[in-house]
Amino acid sequence: MTLLTQSSTWQALSAHSKNVPHMRELFATDAARFNKMSLSACGLLLDYSKNRATAETLDLLFTLASNSQLEAKIKAMFAGEIINTTEKRAVLHTALRSTAEQSIIAEGQDIVPEVQQTLNKMQGFVSSVTSGQWKGYTGKAITDIVSIGIGGSFLGPKIVSQALRPYWNPELKCHFVANVDGTSISEKLKLLDPETTLFIMSSKSFGTQETLTNTLTAREWFLAKGGLQSDVAKHFVAVTSNVAKATDFGIDADNIFPMWDWVGGRYSLWSAIGLPIALLIGMDNFRALLSGAHQMDEHFANAPLTENMPVIMGLLSLWYGNFFNAQSHVVLTYDHYLRGLPAYFQQLDMESNGKSVTLNGTDVDYSTGPVIWGGEGTNGQHAYHQLLHQGTALIPADFIMPLQSHNPIGEHHDQLASNCFGQTQALMQGRTFDEALAELANSALPAAEKQLIAKHKVMPGNKPSNTLLMDKLTPSTLGALIALYEHRTFVQGAIWDINSFDQWGVELGKDLGNDVLTRIGASQDCDALDASSNALINLYRHGKI
């Protein structure tokens, strides 16, 4: 057993998990439960009253957090200590949304001035493009942005841009390319005019395979459509640490934006990686996005554990994963603009906490990161909600909804909200056999069939959920929401004593993929690998099954 699972608090939580009353009973015996188990911060309200939790549960979870030195670990992250120990890096995505008055030291120097300088450079660039001052090679203004990246440099900008669609500049469109599948970029290029298209290439090394391949294809398309190599600088910019490679490609050094080692890819949308967002919504709104995240940073850093929104959410998720064997967690967004958030939170959580050894290399003997999945309401109610209500697996849920819609048409939003709240109520209370049978009382069915149908209509309830509300989806509330989930992820990793900021699981597949690519291009069939890999490679080489 690890020190964590040997601890008296862990053992107490394990025993306590078997004795928590059904949520029906918890609500029936405490009319003030919502008031006691809800919290507002940074423009968000968290209702966590529909959880399998009592005051004793929360006390034990907060004790577990304290005994795991959570507060010290939070301070260490914000102070720029090397908490990504396997890569020997600080973790300072929070510095990207700091104020100009702050001082944050990394590697012996204050990084805030460089962050502010980059924001100011972004401001000038955005102004140049959106005003029409930036011209393409034929003198036309830019109408289309193509953002080329992978992982965090793709998903963050795409999902945030999608979420903030009401704030877009109507003169610009943005297209996101990540997958190395040629179909992805080909379908995008079919829509574009090379004279009015600007490509943003985002890669720390300027050598990420998928991103470089797509960028080279974009340049070939641009040149084939009439552009010259000398025109590349008017249509390509880069976010990278490798200035030399970018300038060799043809990008003007003045149009290269920096990346830093102390920012991980899945936390990078707040940096110049967010340039596509800034172009679409403007720098004032981009700064509001940063401000919302900064407010959540301040809350996370300073609120006591018992009143700390990311801490509470992280602890409750850990509670179900480690003591109720919950293997997945569903995120349900009751706002069409937020439909991409489950995929973003999936990457954030699963790449961060999909680990199986502690910081000192000990194998864990407890579950770590769950599968994160989800979708938008009300679509999911006609699909996977059936599993949530009557399936055998316990799947905690987060419901996210703005109280006000950007598109208040008729009763649409009233119906959306009623479905959201109704789902959380149904998950909590369920339906007993007697209730189901009573609903069939006036049916003409025979008594035996009523009994049978009633059994099929039983829902156990006691299915946990959080509800997150905001007045309206704005850049600020979106920033706070994303930062909330970042810090929630950190809380779990800190208690599990794992490194939430590396991703070695990504590397092996990449390395083997490069080896396979060489074998695909060889002059002879492959016979050097395992039988399955040999067969698959050779089938691909011959182009048919």
UniProtKB/Swiss-Prot annotation:
<keyword id="KW-0312">Gluconeogenesis</keyword>
<comment type="pathway">
    <text>Carbohydrate biosynthesis; gluconeogenesis.</text>
</comment>
<dbReference type="GO" id="GO:0006096">
    <property type="term" value="P:glycolytic process"/>
</dbReference>
<dbReference type="InterPro" id="IPR018189">
    <property type="entry name" value="Phosphoglucose_isomerase_CS"/>
</dbReference>
<dbReference type="GO" id="GO:0004347">
    <property type="term" value="F:glucose-6-phosphate isomerase activity"/>
</dbReference>
<dbReference type="InterPro" id="IPR001672">
    <property type="entry name" value="G6P_Isomerase"/>
</dbReference>
<dbReference type="InterPro" id="IPR046348">
    <property type="entry name" value="SIS_dom_sf"/>
</dbReference>
<dbReference type="GO" id="GO:0006094">
    <property type="term" value="P:gluconeogenesis"/>
</dbReference>
<dbReference type="GO" id="GO:0048029">
    <property type="term" value="F:monosaccharide binding"/>
</dbReference>
<comment type="pathway">
    <text>Carbohydrate degradation; glycolysis; D-glyceraldehyde 3-phosphate and glycerone phosphate from D-glucose: step 2/4.</text>
</comment>
<feature type="active site">
    <location>
        <position position="510"/>
    </location>
</feature>
<dbReference type="InterPro" id="IPR023096">
    <property type="entry name" value="G6P_Isomerase_C"/>
</dbReference>
<dbReference type="InterPro" id="IPR035476">
    <property type="entry name" value="SIS_PGI_1"/>
</dbReference>
<dbReference type="GO" id="GO:0051156">
    <property type="term" value="P:glucose 6-phosphate metabolic process"/>
</dbReference>
<keyword id="KW-0963">Cytoplasm</keyword>
<feature type="active site" description="Proton donor">
    <location>
        <position position="351"/>
    </location>
</feature>
<protein>
    <recommendedName>
        <fullName>Glucose-6-phosphate isomerase</fullName>
        <ecNumber>5.3.1.9</ecNumber>
    </recommendedName>
</protein>
<keyword id="KW-0324">Glycolysis</keyword>
<comment type="function">
    <text>Catalyzes the reversible isomerization of glucose-6-phosphate to fructose-6-phosphate.</text>
</comment>
<comment type="similarity">
    <text>Belongs to the GPI family.</text>
</comment>
<dbReference type="InterPro" id="IPR035482">
    <property type="entry name" value="SIS_PGI_2"/>
</dbReference>
<keyword id="KW-0413">Isomerase</keyword>
<dbReference type="GO" id="GO:0097367">
    <property type="term" value="F:carbohydrate derivative binding"/>
</dbReference>
<dbReference type="Pfam" id="PF00342">
    <property type="entry name" value="PGI"/>
</dbReference>
<feature type="active site">
    <location>
        <position position="382"/>
    </location>
</feature>
<dbReference type="GO" id="GO:0005829">
    <property type="term" value="C:cytosol"/>
</dbReference>
